[in-house]
Amino acid sequence: MSEIEEYDIKDWVEEASTASNQAFRQAVHTILSAIASDSNLKANMILKGGILLAIRYKSHRYTKDIDFSTERKRGGEITEDGVRESLDSSLVQMVEELDYGLDCLVQSSKLEPSNDPKYTYPSIKMKVGYAYKGTSQHKRLLSLRSPDIISIDYSLNEATPNIEDLKLNLEEGILAYSLTDLIAEKYRSLLQQVSRNRSRRQDVYDLNLLIERFGDINNFERGKILNSLMALLHKKGKEG
């Protein structure tokens, strides 16, 4: 497999083409750093999806969502209230440590589907608002009404066969899907689209980006991709 270029999340933030996009990227940096600085959040929130592709693999197509997975089931340390409280507390600390002057607060959270034991693959959905301190937008943020938000989709009871450490700085990192798991996840998504009679061109674009950039994937890596795909399908099922 081709060697992956080194990356720096601060470079990604500074490469923003507009002021609004830079604020969004600063908020992403703040959220990821907040998760990295909390031992329980870091151990259980595995980054995947478009934001990982953007930061780690230089994709230019992504939404204002951050996707995470964990093999843990609902209950114990993994509850809607527990995750929200831990993230909010860690955000307060990280807002002060980073020099962006940007505040971030969890504005809402919910469990989907509902808090019913029959749903074995729920997600914790959160919306994190952000605004620069000293602005009128910050007043709206403090009342949890910021129009500028980042959605977090935290999937529980998901297979995470191969993970790696995504470095945020010299001291901290966040756990993330490996390249093989990202490719396997995209293939699983395509299989789901057939069964659900839906189409998402974004997944095809992402697969093309990864395969073009790392086209010399050897048989060992192909085997890891297949094993990851089988684990994902076995854990949640093709219809999951």
Where are these regions (language model features)?
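Compositionally biased terminal segments of proteins
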Residues: 1-240
